Amino acid sequence: MGSGKDRTLAGWTLPETKTDATAQFDRFVTENRFTIAVVFPLVGAVTLLASAEGLLPDPLAFNPYFVLFGTFVMRLPLVAGIFPLVDRRAGLALVALTLYSYGIELVGVRTGWPYGEFTYGVDLGPMLLGDVPFGLPVFFFPLVLNAYLLVLLLLGNRAASTTVRLLSTLATVMLVDLVLDPGAVAIGFWIYEMPQFYGVPWQNYAGWLLSGSVAVLLFDFGFDRAGLRRRLRDCPFMLDDLVSFVLLWGGINLFYTNWVPFGLAALLGAGLLWTDRFDFDLSETRLGRAVWR
């Protein structure tokens, strides 16, 4: 029950409880689902390719704030999905993973271990200690959590086995990186001194086995699996961020004829289609209502 005070701002009611905030967040993502999951990654792919090919002027080419903003928007379905599940334990796991991701990236940049010698090829925004992008968790966390959620959906009851769940998630994380890194190298996000698989050293994937294992274990420790299953059941957009990933990086790999990474992106897309969660009604979205009004 409200306090009687006016809690409305520009037609938006300020939530009084976490339940209210969850409902409003869900409604916002649902109403903008197509724009977030499809339009943003397609526009992102075009602008990144235009930047890499020298078709955009300097103020726009690889603009780090545009990149961060677009990435953050594409993460909204995942953030909304896990928002009601973040309790003290999950919060501690996220803090630990944040510190770990900054730490291992800093070691990687300065020593070449565990990912191989590399440098950033473009400005990725504010840097922590001058070496690590401050926005790193926005890029890294979702890759692992999306893999974890996809495994829960695809394996069903088989995911109750800790060994099966964790190994399957780690394999999916590696699949994600086999799509991401070749595309990122192709557009010049980062440059490795020992290019091997589409410009990426095999050592990088060994490094991802390490960092991915730690991240998967922390997510498995921090989040209630039964709660995640319920949320996945009730929240059809929860894996839309992975849809965005497939469209964005699959498109970039296709442009540069990176056929193996593109095929792996298609495999991820097939896994998403298998979950039968993305045949949504455009008339439920703001974009659809604007087009068909």
Curated annotation (Swiss-Prot):
It comes from the Archaea. One of its GO terms (biological process) is carotenoid biosynthetic process. One of its GO terms (cellular component) is membrane. Signal peptide: none annotated. It is found in: Membrane. One of its GO terms (molecular function) is hydro-lyase activity. Keywords: Carotenoid biosynthesis, Lyase, Membrane, Transmembrane, Transmembrane helix. Belongs to the BABR hydratase family. Involved in the biosynthesis of the acyclic C50 carotenoid bacterioruberin (BR). Catalyzes the reaction that introduces hydroxyl groups to C3'' and C3''' of bisanhydrobacterioruberin (BABR) to generate BR. This is Bisanhydrobacterioruberin hydratase. It comes from Haloarcula japonica (strain ATCC 49778 / DSM 6131 / JCM 7785 / NBRC 101032 / NCIMB 13157 / TR-1). The gene is cruF.
